[in-house]
Swiss-Prot record:
Signal peptide: none annotated. It holds the Pfam family HEAT_Maestro_2. Disulfide bonds: none annotated. This is Protein MROH8. It comes from the Eukaryota.
Length: 483
């Protein structure tokens, strides 16, 4: 697909994607996890350990790389005209879609002159940074969940055209790597072709065939990737392409939000959230597999086994999340690291401030308690969590939810490595004037051995406090702890 072939046609092309349909809804193929049960002693974690998704198998792409259409050499006048047009963009800004498309077309046309025209070659190589910056802007300006024009396709075509002439815009520097990441994000964030078609039916623009544009865009993206290694097939370039360019920076935050929405009082919202969290589970499994530390293989295998055993109990994995947020915590707990667990807790508490519907609050309480019970030993930011609990307990009105949160505090305080941290936060709040913290003291529920340990640590802290200067003492006068 050279610049000469930039018009959408009805030609069938293969894309690395599939339609989403009710008959082919994503579901964990649990049989693929049998390798874990049968070979648990194996040291290496293989790709077979990761569940596959029926319905999303890709047909192989064409093995024939795209070649630019042979054209007559460009005259010096045309080359100069193209350079002036491109330079004008660098000196100004692209305002309309036609102007943007013209800029991309000019770049592709000029790329064809690189093998024989020194002026074109010198201009392109001296303006790599400008080209990368402009393409970055064009990709960023595209709506992430929409495909209403051929702009993405044109960007991919232009990058490929230059790559075939040994001008690589996605490799070799930080800004080029950023452009590479943006192009991949622009594809990943696209909804399914069915969703895009439905949007077009509701808001027709009459400019293009959505399905054709969707397929052409994916084909252009595929050929752009191929172009990166066709001319320079070195292993380091392959590694750059294969290496995962995206990672969830706030996975715990995302899981918590989706989990809370699974308990939304509006049935439609809860159902869509359940489907979304199911898809997120598949993405998380794949990400964790690709990025996991070799030293942590056994932990990942255990998490996969637990996930498999849990989902075997439910005929539909997506439906098992609907109105049952605590199950989400059970499934995801093994795939969240300590930072992500903290994000999960913080997001759940933050949501309690803005979403005060009883259903949401109940979901939040169940999520917190379930996660704390199963992963309490993995938390590394207990001080931050306790700070949030002490500050926000007053906004939680439902007795059941308050009790669940207090039970979470009980779990933390009963673990020796967290006892002093929890006591410090509770003692630093003036109990006689804070009925919410007084309730925490009264409702703490721990086993007898833990009670003895906690009381001993509490007495030690009280003694230490009385031995310190007055200005350094904690802000409390007395603490009454019911037996």
């Amino acid at each position: 697909m050279s610049s000469k072939h930039r018009i959408c046609s009805q030609e069938e092309v293969v894309i690395p994607c599939a339609y989403d349909s009710d008959s082919e809804s994503v579901d964990l193929e649990l049989s693929n996890l049998e390798i874990i049960k049968k070979g648990s002693s194996s040291i290496e974690l293989t790709d077979l350990d990761i569940p596959d998704i029926p319905g999303l198998h890709c047909e192989p792409l064409s093995h024939s790389p795209r070649h630019l259409t042979q054209q007559d050499p460009l005259s010096e006048a045309i080359v100069e005209k193209l350079i002036q047009s491109i330079q004008k963009v660098f000196n100004g800004e692209l305002k309309g879609e036609l102007e943007k498309l013209k800029f991309l077309g000019d770049l592709s046309s000029l790329s064809q002159a690189l093998p024989y025209d020194e002026t074109a070659k010198s201009f392109i190589h001296s303006h790599i940074a400008d080209i990368v910056h402009t393409l970055n802007v064009l990709v960023q300006e595209e709506r992430p969940h929409s495909l209403s024009s051929s702009m993405r396709q044109e960007v991919f075509v232009t990058i490929a055209d230059l790559s075939y002439q040994d001008v690589h815009l996605l490799l070799g520097s930080e800004d080029r790597a950023e452009l590479f990441s943006l192009t991949i994000k622009s594809i990943i964030t696209l909804p399914s072709v069915r969703t895009l078609t439905q949007i077009q039916e509701i808001m027709p623009n009459g400019t293009c065939n959505t399905e054709c544009l969707y397929r052409q865009t994916f084909q252009a993206f595929s050929e752009m990737l191929q172009s990166l290694v066709v001319k320079d097939p070195h292993l380091e370039n392959l590694d750059t392409i294969i290496k995962l360019p995206l990672r969830f920076q706030r996975l715990g935050h995302l899981v918590a939000l989706m989990a809370l929405l699974c308990g939304d009082p509006q049935e439609k919202v809860a159902e869509e959230a359940a489907e979304g969290i199911h898809s997120l589970l598949h993405i998380t499994l794949r990400l964790k597999y690709i990025t996991h530390d070799k030293k942590d293989q056994q932990n990942l295998k255990r998490a996969l086994t637990k996930c498999r055993e849990f989902l075997e109990l439910h005929s539909s994995a997506a439906k098992c999340f609907y109105n049952c947020p605590f199950r989400i915590a059970q499934v995801f707990e093994g795939f969240l690291d300590s930072n992500e667990l903290c994000q999960f807790i913080m997001t759940t508490f933050d949501t309690l401030k803005t979403l005060k519907h009883p259903c949401i609050q109940r979901s939040a309480g169940e999520l917190l308690l379930t996660l704390a019970k199963n992963t309490e030993s993995q938390f590394e930011k207990v001080p931050e969590i306790m700070g949030v609990i002490c500050a926000q307990l007053s906004i939680i009105s439902q007795p059941r939810v308050r009790q669940q949160i207090i039970n979470t505090v009980s779990l933390f305080i009963s673990r020796p490595k967290y006892t002093d941290i929890v006591l410090s936060f509770l003692l630093c709040h003036p109990v006689p004037y804070n009925r919410h913290l007084a309730e925490v003291w009264r409702m703490l529920s721990v086993e007898l051995p833990s009670t003895t340990w906690i009381l001993w640590r509490l007495l030690r802290k009280l003694q230490k406090c009385h031995n310190e200067p007055a200005q350094e003492k904690m802000a409390y006068v007395a603490v009454a702890v019911s037996p």
